[in-house]
């Protein structure tokens, strides 16, 4: 098989590093209106405030959790069996789907009968694929437009709120100053949301199931949940919700095995990946994808043209609509939740890329551009777009309309080719919505900071507020090896301006296929960017975690500082490099300033002085300055004293 020949289905096992709970964290479930709506969250426990700081209780903080059952010690994890079919009952009870007697795609049947791949295949699936009954539409958008609040929508509303109201209520009972503490910890700076309706002075204080339904019906948000991926935990992508992060994984012709890609998926979701795209281009794409989907609690996206190209031995000009259609059905019946489809690469735009510094950098875009030139006609993706919609709504696969002409350098940013394609994607969005097919739009790419908002504004206008999903953008081209940072800058900005999901970039971008460590670095960097965007927009409750960590920092609760952070392991590692002893975990200083120059310790000294003198903090500062002034004059009023 791939470069690593060791993977066999019988020996498959979970990555042990991905199943241990994070420090001082436990998985909790919030039940909805019915017992089978159990929404997972991560509860981070905190130590009490030391008596010297007031001695109050610090209740647990709840955070969004994408890790699925993997971080639940009560769950039995066996990747050979896959995850439980969480949504199966919801799908079946709607009565608009049917279980097929077998696979519909020619390629799927061919692979199932191939004895050469039998030892690689996932053997744990004991159900056949489902499809909409003839004449039915099973998309979440279709239900939303009919006024139906699905269990998925209720699940999402609970998940987005992160038990914020319960946390603030628990603060009120934490001690005699509970009401004051709740007001302080719940305080949040007003955001600038650039027109996003959920935020601002008249915005929401919490997300409701009805609001979720309205946003999906409007096309401003999508719920990527294929009916053949019932293992997935419902989530939402839209500018009026928490900014999400996607992680790209996948093998290539020269590296990685099925086992490694499953490990990358479990590692990505441990650190906060909201969706995962399998971009495999090497051998056994079908089998790799099956293992990933069956073991993924988050939506899985793909670029179907990659696999279609493999079926014609890499010759783009030999691609046909029939081959591509069969590939869509094959992947839809496996359970892929969203497809990147480069239907906006039109023949008329291809010559516009000749003036670029870096030409066409999208793999999918270059494949379709080559096909258009070879046949001198519009691509079969564009010509058959409504046929594709018919497939999508039969399985509830969402469109991720690909930016095949995205700029690959800041030199090419916002050029005619890029913006022409974006306008076409807006036109295709209207066609998809006519079929009630959920749709998001992919965006750049490499864009300098001053041009980022123009990208967002044009997308909102031309694509009628369909969710934007961007790769970065990278804000400079001078830092190979650090493109998670060059792109994280742009990601935070465009997330603030309205992008709904950010596609991570790892340190290996432009250099090689990322390993597990690179995946973690990319995810953490992009969770940081997404959270910064949520804060800037004024997402209700976004600042709760910041406030909790800042309070822990001021009270020298080191363990709580580590555990409330995005990467507790890294924070603890850095601290322990210079102060490894357990006693340092309760010290009132760190190695940066030492015991005598810690600004927070000095502030505490001022407060203690104020309490002793019976004055306010401001009065204490003034009084302390007067004492020092007298002392200074007595020593001769010299700035530098001889010792």
Curated annotation (Swiss-Prot):
Pfam families linked: ThiC-associated, ThiC_Rad_SAM
Pathway, per record: Cofactor biosynthesis; thiamine diphosphate biosynthesis
Example GO molecular function: carbon-carbon lyase activity
Residues the entry annotates as binding Zn(2+): 446, 510
Cofactor note: Binds 1 [4Fe-4S] cluster per subunit. The cluster is coordinated with 3 cysteines and an exchangeable S-adenosyl-L-methionine.
Necessary cofactors: [4Fe-4S] cluster
Annotated EC: 4.1.99.17
Keywords: 4Fe-4S, Iron, Iron-sulfur, Lyase, Metal-binding, S-adenosyl-L-methionine, Thiamine biosynthesis, Zinc
Annotated residues for binding of substrate: 248, 277, 306, 342, 362-364, 403-406, 442, 469
A GO biological-process term: thiamine biosynthetic process
Chain residues that bind [4Fe-4S] cluster: 590, 593, 598
Gene3D superfamilies per UniProt: 6.10.250.620, Radical SAM ThiC family, central domain
Recorded catalytic activity of this chain's protein: 5-amino-1-(5-phospho-beta-D-ribosyl)imidazole + S-adenosyl-L-methionine = 4-amino-2-methyl-5-(phosphooxymethyl)pyrimidine + CO + 5'-deoxyadenosine + formate + L-methionine + 3 H(+)
Any one of the GO CC terms: cytosol
Described function: Catalyzes the synthesis of the hydroxymethylpyrimidine phosphate (HMP-P) moiety of thiamine from aminoimidazole ribotide (AIR) in a radical S-adenosyl-L-methionine (SAM)-dependent reaction.
Record-stated family: Belongs to the ThiC family.
Assembly, per entry: Homodimer.
Name the record gives this protein: Phosphomethylpyrimidine synthase
UniProt organism field: Paraburkholderia xenovorans (strain LB400)
């Amino acid at each position: 098989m791939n470069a690593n020949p060791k993977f066999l289905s019988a020996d498959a096992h979970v990555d042990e590093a991905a199943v241990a709970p994070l420090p001082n964290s436990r998985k909790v479930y919030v039940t909805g209106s019915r017992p089978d709506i159990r929404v997972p969250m991560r509860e981070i426990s905190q130590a009490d405030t030391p008596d010297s700081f007031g001695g109050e209780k610090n209740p647990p903080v709840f955070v969004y959790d994408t890790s699925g059952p993997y971080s639940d010690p009560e769950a039995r994890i066996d990747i050979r069996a896959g995850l439980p079919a969480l949504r199966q009952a919801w799908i079946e009870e709607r009565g608009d789907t049917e279980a097929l007697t077998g696979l519909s795609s020619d390629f799927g049947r061919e692979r199932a009968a191939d004895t050469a791949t039998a030892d690689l295949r996932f053997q744990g699936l004991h159900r056949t694929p489902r499809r909409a009954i003839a004449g039915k539409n099973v998309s979440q958008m279709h239900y939303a437009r009919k006024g139906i609040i699905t269990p998925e929508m209720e699940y999402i509303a609970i998940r987005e709120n992160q038990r914020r109201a319960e946390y603030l209520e628990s603060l009120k009972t934490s001690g005699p100053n509970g009401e004051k503490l709740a007001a302080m910890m719940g305080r949040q700076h007003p955001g600038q949301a650039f027109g996003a309706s959920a935020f601002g002075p008249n915005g929401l204080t919490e997300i409701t199931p009805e609001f979720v339904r309205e946003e999906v019906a409007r096309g401003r948000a999508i719920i990527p949940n294929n009916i053949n991926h019932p293992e997935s935990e419902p989530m939402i992508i839209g500018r009026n919700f928490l900014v999400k992060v996607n992680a790209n994984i996948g093998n290539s012709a020269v590296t990685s095995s099925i086992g490694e890609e499953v490990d990358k998926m479990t590692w990505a979701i441990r650190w906060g990946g909201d969706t995962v795209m399998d971009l495999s281009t090497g051998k056994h794409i079908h089998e790799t994808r099956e293992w990933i989907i069956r073991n993924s609690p988050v939506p899985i996206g793909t670029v179907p043209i990659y696999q279609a190209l493999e079926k014609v031995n890499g010759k783009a000009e030999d691609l046909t609509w029939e081959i591509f259609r069969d590939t869509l059905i094959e992947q839809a019946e496996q359970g892929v939740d969203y497809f990147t489809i480069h239907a906006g690469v039109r023949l008329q735009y291809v010559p516009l890329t000749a003036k670029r510094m870096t030409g066409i950098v999208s793999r999918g875009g270059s494949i379709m551009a080559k096909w258009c030139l070879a046949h001198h006609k519009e691509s079969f993706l564009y010509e058959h777009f409504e046929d594709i919609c018919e497939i999508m709504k039969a399985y509830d696969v969402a469109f991720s309309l690909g930016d095949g002409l995205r700029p690959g350098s800041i030199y090419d940013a916002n050029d005619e080719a890029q913006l022409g394609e974006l306008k076409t994607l807006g036109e295709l969005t209207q066609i998809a919505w006519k079929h009630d097919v959920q749709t998001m739009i992919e965006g750049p790419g490499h864009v300098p900071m001053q041009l980022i908002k123009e990208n967002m504004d044009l997308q909102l206008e031309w694509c009628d507020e369909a969710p934007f999903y961007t790769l970065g953008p990278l804000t400079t081209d001078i830092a190979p090896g650090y493109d998670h940072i060059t792109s994280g800058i742009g990601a935070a900005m465009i997330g603030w301006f309205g992008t709904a999901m950010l596609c991570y970039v790892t340190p290996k971008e432009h250099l090689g296929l990322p390993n597990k460590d690179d995946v973690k670095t990319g995810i953490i960097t992009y969770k940081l960017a997404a959270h910064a965007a949520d804060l800037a927009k004024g997402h209700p409750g976004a600042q709760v975690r910041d406030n909790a960590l800042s309070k822990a920092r001021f009270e020298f609760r080191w363990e709580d500082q580590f555990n409330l952070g995005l990467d507790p392991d890294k924070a603890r590692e850095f601290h322990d490099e210079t102060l490894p002893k357990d006693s340092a975990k309760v010290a009132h200083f760190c190695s940066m300033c030492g015991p005598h120059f810690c600004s927070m310790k000095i502030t505490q000294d001022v407060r203690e002085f104020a309490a002793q003198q019976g004055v306010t903090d401001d009065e204490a500062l003034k009084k302390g300055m007067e004492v020092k002034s007298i002392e200074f004059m007595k020593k001769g009023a010299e700035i530098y004293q001889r010792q």
